[in-house]
């Protein structure tokens, strides 16, 4: 099993490399704005909050690459999935030299306002990766930060395996399957391999999920609480939505306190101390650098003292709208929307996904019936309901936050599918439990071959998605033209034969992984 796990990580890493290489520069969500903040931290030692904050180097590259926004916030790709920049007939882009030959001053000559002003942790780490390629051209530095994001994603894949070990206990193949589904989920890989803080948010949230499950399994330990505190501080220093994680941790703590009431006093004091800290951070310490990361403007600026504007009926209306919006728009985004939200996957992909998810839900219904019929209260059942409750709480808190935002601004913030990725391991694990329930009933001794089939389908979905996206950017009519176009506006070490070599290794490791998954499943079947 250890060899299989190592093979999974190698395969997942090369898959992430392929996404990094084939996705053109500035084609991840707001990548140029996130990179501008990384560049400011690396070059200026601070985040610009007043005046221009984006370098001439980035601005010029945006104009050349078609991602420069107009007055409405749109670029040439927005609403136009057919658009592409003009390509040359070799591995060097038509205007690649203009970007590569810019003077050093172009990195600090700020010409427009576009950089993000997000909490600092990801950008601090990104600045380290940036400096590792400091003397390189723009493409070198972007890919250095992308590689850092991909390595963090490998940490998320590892955590998915560790979480699988807890919730599936002795069923090791289930843990490997969960990690495989996470490693090759295409939209997750996409958002985890660009210059954006999602990958760190997802990793830290997954770590919180893992520690919460450890509390359910082993009880409350001081070392676990220290790690949780550290993860929460790091998470809030990455994304402010990370505050939601405190609700999830609290559930695990509540469970242990219910079993051991002696912890009640310490828990209540901790909750009061945390609430007081949030209040002070949002009132008296709001202008201090570290404490601004804990700011909750939707509560303290618009809704906290305006209870007359909050209506239960209006919230229910907003909740119903959110559920419909989630099904019609957010759900497809969860599985894949690319190219500045202009490119979706072929409809048949979503149709297959929806039917498979319905099969998984059927398995969950059967599982719930069996749990209540047998009155099961074992650890696996506790883990199942914890993951289910965590997912529902996350959705509800996000909906309440969006409702408060709506009160203050008159419109919804606009929830995207990737906003739910912090709990993607929980979502996939829940569905996997449903499938496993069905496999045990209908496949009996061959149930583990069903698990391999799921992993195989996700890998195929990943490859088809990447091919579909790459085909929207590059001419795939011949391998020579495809490699030439994919090489343009990339670092020197990510051109021509390097691309072909990486793609070949990726397919090879995927085939090896599938082979050994099948071999392992057959061995356990016998």
Protein language model annotation of sequence segments:
Residues 45-145, 302-306, 336, 341-343:
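Interfacial juxtamembrane loops and adjacent helix segments
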Residues 168, 208-224:
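Membrane-interface transmembrane helices that cradle and orient dolichyl/undecaprenyl
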Residues 144-168, 207:
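Transmembrane-helix motifs of polytopic, lipid-linked glycan transferases
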Residues 224-240, 245:
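Membrane-interface alpha helices of multi-pass inner-membrane proteins
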Residues 286-371, 486-503:
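Membrane-lumen/periplasm interface segments of multi-pass, membrane-embedded glycan/lipid transferases
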Residues 277-278, 305-307, 313, 445-526:
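Transmembrane helical bundles and short interhelical boundary loops of multi-pass, membrane-embedded
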Residues 6, 139, 160-184, 446-449:
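Transmembrane-helix signature of polytopic, membrane-embedded enzymes
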Residues 211-217, 245-276, 369:
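Perimembrane helix-loop-helix junctions
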């Amino acid at each position: 099993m250890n060899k299989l796990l190592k093979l999974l990580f190698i395969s997942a890493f090369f898959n992430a490399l392929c996404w990094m290489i084939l996705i053109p520069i500035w084609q991840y969500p707001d990548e140029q704005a996130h990179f501008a903040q990384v560049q400011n931290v690396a070059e200026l030692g601070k985040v610009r909050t007043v005046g221009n904050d984006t370098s001439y180097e980035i601005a010029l590259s945006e104009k050349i690459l078609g991602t420069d926004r107009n007055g409405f916030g749109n670029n040439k790709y927005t609403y136009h999935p057919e658009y592409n920049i003009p390509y040359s007939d070799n591995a060097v882009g038509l205007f690649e030299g203009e970007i590569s030959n810019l003077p050093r001053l172009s990195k600090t000559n700020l010409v427009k306002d576009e950089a993000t002003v997000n909490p600092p942790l990801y950008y601090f780490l990104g600045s380290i990766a940036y400096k590792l390629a400091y003397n390189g051209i723009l493409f070198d530095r972007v890919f250095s930060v992308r590689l850092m994001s991909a390595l963090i994603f490998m940490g998320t894949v590892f955590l998915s395996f560790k979480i699988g070990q807890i919730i599936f206990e002795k069923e090791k193949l289930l843990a490997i399957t969960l990690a495989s589904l996470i490693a090759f989920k295409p939209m997750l890989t996409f958002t985890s391999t660009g210059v954006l803080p999602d990958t760190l948010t997802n990793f830290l949230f997954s770590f919180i999920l893992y520690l919460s499950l450890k509390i359910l399994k082993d009880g409350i330990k001081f070392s676990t609480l220290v790690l949780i505190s550290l993860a929460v501080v790091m998470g809030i220093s990455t994304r402010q939505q990370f505050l939601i994680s405190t609700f999830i941790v609290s559930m695990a703590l509540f469970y242990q306190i219910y079993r051991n009431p002696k912890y009640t006093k310490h828990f209540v004091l901790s909750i009061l101390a945390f609430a007081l800290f949030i209040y002070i951070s949002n009132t008296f310490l709001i202008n201090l650098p570290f404490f601004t990361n804990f700011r909750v403007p939707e509560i303290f600026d618009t809704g906290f003292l305006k209870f007359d504007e909050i209506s239960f009926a209006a919230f229910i209306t907003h909740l119903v709208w959110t559920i419909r919006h989630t099904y019609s728009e957010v759900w497809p985004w969860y599985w894949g929307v690319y190219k500045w939200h202009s490119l979706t996957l072929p409809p048949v992909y979503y149709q297959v996904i929806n039917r498979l998810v319905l099969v998984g839900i059927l398995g969950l219904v059967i599982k719930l019936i069996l749990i209540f019929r047998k009155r099961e209260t074992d650890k696996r059942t506790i883990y199942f309901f914890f993951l289910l409750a965590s997912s529902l709480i996350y959705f509800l808190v996000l909906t309440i936050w969006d409702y408060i935002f709506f009160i203050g601004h008159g419109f919804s913030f606009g929830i995207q599918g990737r906003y739910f990725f912090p709990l993607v391991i929980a979502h996939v694990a829940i569905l996997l439990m449903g499938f496993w329930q069905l496999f045990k009933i209908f496949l009996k001794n061959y149930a583990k071959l069903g698990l391999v089939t799921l992993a195989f389908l996700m890998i195929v979905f990943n490859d088809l998605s990447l091919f579909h996206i790459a085909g929207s950017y590059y001419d795939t009519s011949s391998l020579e033209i495809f490699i030439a176009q994919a090489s343009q506006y990339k670092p020197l070490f990510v051109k021509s034969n390097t691309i072909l070599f990486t793609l070949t290794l990726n397919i090879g490791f995927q085939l090896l992984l599938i082979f050994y998954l099948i071999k392992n499943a057959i061995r356990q079947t016998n």
